[in-house]
Amino acid sequence: MDLSELEDFFADRFATSEAVSSQHSHDESWHVPENLPDAVVFPETSNEVSRIISFASENNIPVIPFGTGTALEGHVHAVNGGITIDSRNMNKVIQVNMEDMDCRVQAGVTREELNSFLRDTGLFFPVDPGANASIGGMCSTGASGTNTVKYGTIREQVIGLEVIM
């Protein structure tokens, strides 16, 4: 599998080492990974994610999203190898709208980062699955937690998503 185009573009945000691939081959579930991803890429923008997805689509390469690796579902396993997209560098709170009590964030923002950012506004993000999961990861798993009875799951907290396919 020739991934040199991505390696050239992403440079130090592109990894193929066994150590990095191994870190991205599992989550907190009981599932044992049988394969490693062929590469792990760390995009910073939606356009970069789109570039990775386009490359993978053109070359028939599986893509695996990776937030913080705290999920219990086993969905981050690279069953057929492929490219793991780690969203940790997509960690910006883009906008907070006090009047509407909503905000826009990138997928890699964690719940603790968001609540730290919101602390002085009087707002908070109520979904608490126990782990310091990323917002993107929580959306992908339908996260819930200790505040679900009062505030609902992630499903009730999300107004919209930008999805790149």
What are these regions (language model features)?
Residues 1-31, 58-62:
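N-terminal accessory segments
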Residues 29-32, 74-79, 152:
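Short glycine-biased active-site loop of nucleotidyltransferases that positions the nucleotide triphosphate
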Residues 137:
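Beta-strand-loop-alpha "switch" segments that mediate conformational coupling across diverse proteins
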Residues 6, 31-63, 87-129, 143-165:
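N-terminal glycine-rich flavin-associated loop
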Residues 80-87:
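Short basic, glycine-rich beta-strand/loop surfaces that mediate nucleic-acid
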